[in-house]
Amino acid sequence: MTRADLNMREIPKRGLEMKKEQVVEEVLDRIDSKELVQLALDLGNIDSPTGCEGEIGEFVYGWLQQQGFAPRKLGLFRNRFNVVATLPGNSQGRGLVLNSHMDTTIAKEEIWTTRGAADPIFHSAWREGDLLIGNGICNDKGPMAAWLIAAKALRESGVRLKGDLILTAVVGEIGLEPVDEFQPPEYLAKEAGTRYAVTHGAVGDCALVAEGTDFGLVWVEAGKAFFKITVFGEDVPLYTPYIQRPTPIERSPNAIVRMARLIELLEDWAHEYEHRHRYECPGGVVVPKVNIGAIRGGVPYKITKTVQQCAIYVDVRITPAQNPLDVRQELRDLVSRAGLNGEVELYVYRRGYEGQRVEPLAEAIQRAHQQIFGELPKVAPAPFSSMWRDINVFNEVGIPAITYGPGASVGGGNFAMRIEDLVTAANLYALIALDVCNQQRNAA
């Protein structure tokens, strides 16, 4: 089925009968906007950079207990656990997983990626008029608060769903990937989060990953391949007084200087690469971008000799159709074309996926969206489907997954979310759960 098919055809009214409209009203009336704002701020004011999710995990666990749920801690590490709770159905309907991540993108000491790494906007949250401000609000505690409040409303309403509603607040969605001396357990992310939760029982018939898409539908995401590209200088380091100039960049005795030539070529290659590998499907458009995220060479306390080796660390996004070994070969060819002696190491590979059999969930989202907005959801812009999100984990294991939520990604510089959008999201998540979890489950 194509997106056009979904958009053009009449969406069947299944899951909720007309006589149950009063149930919908009962649930939505229980969504308290003030409570939602306070929960989002409480979550946003717990600093939780990747690897330090213990405090927020305890908060979510305690909040769910207070609301009458029976949460579980599912963790690869004792101090970094996922929180899972279930609003049980009667086993006749579809099970829906709601998913958001608790970790945030910036630790205070990360001054070499973000000059203002300790700034409050990355570690706290506050209200300004009709906006909630903060990195954590947008990614991903605001959407999480929305479905937590929706789940509370469903439980308090007394409605009995046919299928389970599974709530998953996870760690490690934002990748800290092991490389060089940076090794687990301190440097390990995605294996501890949604993947661990799913492989330890947090499964349903479909999954809605609540992250910012500006309320557009996305069921494809890019994968990623991380490469360490090392360039070598001369066999014998030269003391500064012995350096000869002029020398062509690629012939410099200093590997750092030689790397400048490769970076120039890599930037040109990246532009061509993203156009050559553009991937379009009903679930979205993947434009695989490339970024040089780190560089190492020499030591700052001893700079009196030329450097024999310099490495760059390159984030290459890949589509569901690509093989990372093909990308590695292209990078090796680039090093050769630069006339450099070097090596290319693939140190992370996480495949991207296009969701399959997503129609029941997609149609439920469309019904809810149309009920709230009076129109069908639009196609989400390409950046929303060109990044890593945990729908990849669900789609990999055969659980049809879609990303759908309020606001935009902080990756583009957005650090504010409208309160109105959060309240709308809570209403939408409640409607979607009522719909999906009241659909008859058919055995695969």
Label for each model-derived stretch:
Residues 5-7:
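Intrinsic-disorder-associated, low-complexity terminal segments enriched in Asp/Asn/His/Tyr and depleted
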Residues 11-25, 73, 106, 228, ...:
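Metal-dependent amide/peptide-bond hydrolase catalytic core
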Residues 12-137, 156-161:
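Acidic/His- and Gly-rich active-site-bordering loop/insert found
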Residues 95-97, 132, 205-209, 228, ...:
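Short glycine-aspartate micro-motif
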Residues 101, 211, 237:
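Histidine-centered divalent metal-coordination motifs
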Residues 108-124, 176-197, 239-251:
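Charged, glycine/proline-rich intrinsically disordered loops and linkers
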Residues 128-130, 150-166, 269-276, 436-444:
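Phosphate-handling active-site elements
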Residues 140-226:
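Acidic/histidine-rich catalytic neighborhood of metal-dependent amide-processing enzymes
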